[in-house]
Amino acid sequence: YGWSWMIPEEIVEKFYCVMLHPSPLPKYRGGSPIQNQIINGEKESAVTLFKINKDIDAGDIIYQEPFSLEGDLKEVLGRIVEVGSYLTNKMIYNFYNLDLQKQDHDKATLYKRRKPEESEIFIEDFNTLTAEQIHDKIRCLQDPYPNAFITCKGGTKLYLKKSDYERH
């Protein structure tokens, strides 16, 4: 996960190339799918195993398996690895009997990879966002990603590596 380059078209045409993407494609195509889903308030996602084509995350779907976005980022990433391994083994075992499904491109959403400066939480956010929204922004930007931060007086950055949130 985290592949940021397009595989050359001549490779895609010559070989049966597949990829795992941590979103329920066609939704959340492109970069930073985990962060974008959590920031958008999604609670559930899916790992999608798909056949690569020339477009970004737009190939035919081989398998798609749901997983929860709840918990800290380490837990979420662990679930993604577990589901991705399961789907890869399933594909290898059933390779000659795969039933690929076309993506509904009309339902596609495409996101760019988040930039470190987008990890900033502004003081105004505490007046406009809910506690859950701020918590989600902090937890989806835990290591190994650029952590959420607040810029303090004098330009010093206070990094927010973890938050706890209690629903009432």
Regions of interest found by a model, annotated:
Residues 1-110, 120:
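Donor/substrate-binding cores of folate-linked one-carbon enzymes
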Residues 103-168:
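Internal anion-binding site segments
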